[in-house]
């Protein structure tokens, strides 16, 4: 019953309160962990037996979890986590970086552990809960959009469309799980209608990153479905090459010229160009330098480096670079970037090994959707955004995958 509640709650509440994902997913992970521990504890038939039996079963569970952890082939993940931890020692504010590190990698650890548990029971009902939760999230968006924030204004003084950006990002990646479920059930028309509905929703939202990510996800789905013999190699080469070239390109662009020509009515997008250009030049000065985990917001900026654009003063690095590649390179250096791209390569290879064509295509689409949003928006280490990725991973592995013969 608890699983139904959370699987419905995360996408629905997440639409109007995106940051809630950090709390709801964390609680969901903890409850799942406790449920699996409780399953190993025998019923208390008699008091003499219970304490010993409980202790033995807990030890067996811990042993199984440890063995599963070792069997997860997470050497690259451990190297990356270790490098992030080392970077905290060289951070501008070491204590803050260490606290952020513990928060991020605690939820990642919980997510990886729970994702290797047994598949969910009563999956048909859980799938319905996810579909209803996603549709409720879509309905809440349109309620807010056409009522100018009726629900939001109950709790806040005013409403702006950008307040739904996080909810739109969550919807864009969760929708791929629902699409995978509908396709597996041979409900192709509802799957297509859902894609078009979400695409339309994102097009009228203020979340350009989610719209681009979901649009490219659709293109990737089609390509992965119809040119499967070479698609795996193409996407790995394209994504890693593009990621490596991005800091170079960002350092060479003329942000003012591009903004004047293409982004006169999109100040937020124009500001992104100035941020990327500034961060890329900072990286070029000392490419091996480690600024520390999640330390972008503490980067010192001179008065002469402030941006003066059309009479407005913009900060060249407000909080974070709004690009996962630039942020990781700035904070962790080229070694950190190499480890991060090794993870990207590993996960794309794992997706490429999925035997079921539709599930593989949905997984590629979801991965690209998440990656593209990270290339345009959000701090790569934001808890709610990390929790969103863990949420989708668990749904794919424990809710969708068990009903499909997928691994070669």
Swiss-Prot record:
The family this protein is said to belong to: Belongs to the O-antigen ligase family.
What are the transmembrane regions? Answer: 5-25, 72-92, 94-114, 130-150, 163-183, 192-212, 230-250, 325-345, 359-377, 380-400
Intrachain disulfide bonds = none
Which cellular component terms (GO) are annotated to the entry?
membrane
UniProt KW keywords: Membrane, Transmembrane, Transmembrane helix
Q: Which InterPro entries match?
A: O-antigen_ligase-rel_domated, WaaL-like
Q: Does the keyword Cell wall biogenesis/degradation apply?
A: no
Superkingdom assignment: Bacteria
Q: Where in the cell is it found?
A: Membrane
Q: Which organism is it from?
A: Rickettsia bellii (strain RML369-C)
UniProt topology in membrane: Multi-pass membrane protein
* Name of the protein described by the UniProt record: Putative polysaccharide ligase RBE_0399
One Pfam match, given by its short name, reads Wzy_C
């Amino acid at each position: 019953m608890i699983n139904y509640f959370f699987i419905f709650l995360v996408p629905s509440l997440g639409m109007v309160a995106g940051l809630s994902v950090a709390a709801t997913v964390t609680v969901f992970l903890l409850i799942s962990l406790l449920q699996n521990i409780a399953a190993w504890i025998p019923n208390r038939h008699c008091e003499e037996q219970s304490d010993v039996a409980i202790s033995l079963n807990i030890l067996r569970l811990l042993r199984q979890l440890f063995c599963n952890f070792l069997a997860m082939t997470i050497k690259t993940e451990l190297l990356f986590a270790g490098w992030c931890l080392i970077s905290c020692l060289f951070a501008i504010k070491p204590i803050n970086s260490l606290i952020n590190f513990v928060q991020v990698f605690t939820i990642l650890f919980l997510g990886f552990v729970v994702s290797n548990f047994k598949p969910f029971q009563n999956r048909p009902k859980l799938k319905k809960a996810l579909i209803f939760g996603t549709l409720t999230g879509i309905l809440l968006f349109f309620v807010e959009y056409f009522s100018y924030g009726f629900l939001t204004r109950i709790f806040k003084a005013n409403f702006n469309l950008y307040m739904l950006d996080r909810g739109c990002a969550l919807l864009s990646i969760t929708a791929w799980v629902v699409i995978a479920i509908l396709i597996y059930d041979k409900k192709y028309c509802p799957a297509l209608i859902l894609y078009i509905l979400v695409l339309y929703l994102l097009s009228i939202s203020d979340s350009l990153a989610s719209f681009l990510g979901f649009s490219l996800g659709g293109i990737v789905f089609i390509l992965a479905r119809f040119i499967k013999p070479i698609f795996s190699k193409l996407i790995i080469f394209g994504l890693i090459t593009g990621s490596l070239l991005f800091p170079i390109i960002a350092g060479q662009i003329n942000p003012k010229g591009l903004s004047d020509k293409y982004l006169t009515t999109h100040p937020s997008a124009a500001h992104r160009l100035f941020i990327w250009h500034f961060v890329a030049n900072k990286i070029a000065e000392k490419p091996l330098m480690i600024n520390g985990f999640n330390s972008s917001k503490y980067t010192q900026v001179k008065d002469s480096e402030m941006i003066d654009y059309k009479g407005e003063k913009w900060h060249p690095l407000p909080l974070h670079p709004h690009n996962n590649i630039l942020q990781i390179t700035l904070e962790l250096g080229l070694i950190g970037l190499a480890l991060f791209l090794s993870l990207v390569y590993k996960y794309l290879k794992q997706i490429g090994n999925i035997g079921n064509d539709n599930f593989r295509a949905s997984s590629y689409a979801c991965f690209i959707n998440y990656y593209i949003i990270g290339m345009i928006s959000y701090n790569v280490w934001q808890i709610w955004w990390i929790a969103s990725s863990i949420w989708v991973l668990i749904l794919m592995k424990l809710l969708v995958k068990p009903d499909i013969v997928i691994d070669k």
